[in-house]
């Protein structure tokens, strides 16, 4: 491990705090913790990084490493060499069978994966060639989250160098909008409704009080995802249904549908909303997308579709020098207005800080006013900048708003 430590000493430490999350199986977690916690204690002491491992009896656990860049990379180095040591000690099935490479699975917000892949895959190819490690970005989101798994495998030295380069990319490209963190034990979303109509944030993110949740809604025009409306006491989803319709460019509709409809099915399941994508009209450059459900379901579906669009645009990239087109982005009026807004869910504009929830710097969350045929009073319609694939400007019309 001396060679890796020397590399850490050569690199100047950045004056920032870095948080790296890794997805590990139970056997790997047991190896990192060690007997009576001795191994993880030693890693903490020698690296000076803060290391936490999520609780739970599920097969997978989240290991979170926080600290200075040097501390985090030192901890990753020790973890990689420990896993390599375990592989060397494992009995081989055959004399000529080569042992598998060390593998780490990083958990990264989907909005940052586009920068990691680069235009036409140039960035990830560069990382593979310069580090000698194998890097694979998962095509699908981790369940009930807006994060993806990035798998890094190879010898420990290659993995450490690869993790450095990945961290450099994500530090230069902060996540866009709110991030729904992945938690292996969750099955109903990150924010779940409790029996007293308060929303509790699962995992190591603290608790949001019922009073705060009544005001917690939009971040830059997009609602923070809640649980399925069927979980709300006293709220009958069938009587609270409304619809929103918007347009998505033909060249981006594929990322919303996914391979064999996998992505749109995932969004339907997570949001609880009914999503219909209209047929392509002759000569039209857009497709009609209709979301039907409760305001909460619509807001979550809207957020997840936006995440798909942003990831697709950042991955494909725009034409150099092309100017973005300003597109008005308000949704069309609800087809069926909400009869009576439950007092425990909707309220007037309000801001609270939930930095622990999204794991980022404090960001104000703005309330979503009750559904109405027009834009809410006091809030101006916002616009989205979207560059056309061929660099030309598109005519102004109703568009889906990126977050």
UniProtKB/Swiss-Prot annotation:
It holds the Pfam family KH_1. Its main location: cytoplasm. Keywords: Cytoplasm, DNA-binding, Repeat, Ribonucleoprotein, RNA-binding. It is found in: Cytoplasm. Residues 17-67, 101-154, 241-293 form the KH domain. One of its GO terms (molecular function) is DNA binding. The keyword Ribonucleoprotein applies. It comes from the Eukaryota. One of its GO terms (biological process) is regulation of transcription by RNA polymerase II. GO terms for cellular component: cytoplasm; nucleus; ribonucleoprotein complex. Signal peptide: none annotated. Single-stranded nucleic acid binding protein that binds preferentially to oligo dC. This is Poly(rC)-binding protein 4. It comes from Bos taurus. The lineage of its organism: Eukaryota, Metazoa, Chordata, Craniata, Vertebrata.
């Amino acid at each position: 491990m001396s060679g890796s430590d020397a590399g850490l000493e050569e690199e100047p430490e950045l004056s920032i705090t870095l948080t790296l999350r890794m997805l590990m199986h139970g056997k790997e977690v047991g190896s990192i913790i060690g007997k009576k916690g001795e191994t993880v204690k030693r890693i903490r002491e020698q690296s000076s990084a803060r290391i936490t491992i999520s609780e739970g009896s599920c097969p997978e656990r989240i290991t979170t490493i926080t600290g200075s860049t040097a501390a985090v990379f030192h901890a990753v180095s020790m973890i990689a060499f420990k896993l390599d040591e375990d592989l060397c000690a494992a009995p081989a099935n055959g004399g000529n069978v080569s042992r598998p490479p060390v593998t780490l699975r990083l958990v990264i917000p989907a909005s940052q994966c586009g920068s990691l892949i680069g235009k036409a895959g140039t960035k990830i190819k560069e990382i593979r060639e310069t580090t000698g490690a194998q890097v694979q970005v998962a095509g699908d989101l981790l369940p009930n989250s807006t994060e993806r798994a990035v798998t890094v495998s190879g010898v420990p030295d290659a993995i450490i160098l690869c993790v450095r380069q990945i961290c450099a990319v994500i530090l230069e490209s902060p996540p866009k909008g709110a991030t729904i963190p992945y938690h292996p034990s969750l099955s109903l979303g990150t924010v779940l409704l409790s029996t007293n109509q308060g929303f509790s944030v699962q995992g190591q993110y603290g608790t949001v009080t019922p009073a705060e949740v009544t005001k917690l809604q939009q971040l830059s025009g997009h609602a923070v995802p809640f649980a399925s409306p069927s979980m709300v006491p006293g709220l009958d989803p069938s009587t609270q249904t409304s619809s929103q319709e918007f347009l998505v460019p033909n060249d981006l509709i594929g990322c919303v549908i996914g391979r064999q409809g996998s992505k749109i099915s995932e969004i339907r399941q997570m949001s609880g909303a009914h999503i219909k994508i209209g047929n392509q009209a002759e000569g039209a450059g857009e497709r009609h997308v209709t979301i039907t459900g409760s305001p909460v379901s619509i807001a979550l579906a809207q957020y997840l579709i936006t995440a798909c669009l942003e990831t697709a645009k950042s991955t494909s990239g725009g034409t150099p020098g092309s100017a973005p087109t300003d597109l008005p982005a308000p949704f069309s009026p609800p087809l069926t207005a909400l009869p009576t807004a439950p007092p425990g869910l909707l309220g007037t504009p309000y801001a609270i800080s939930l930095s622990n929830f999204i794991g980022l710097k404090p960001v104000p969350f703005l309330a979503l006013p009750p559904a109405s045929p027009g834009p809410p009073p006091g809030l101006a319609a916002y616009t989205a900048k979207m560059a056309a694939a061929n660099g030309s400007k598109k005519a102004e019309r109703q568009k889906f708003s990126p977050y």
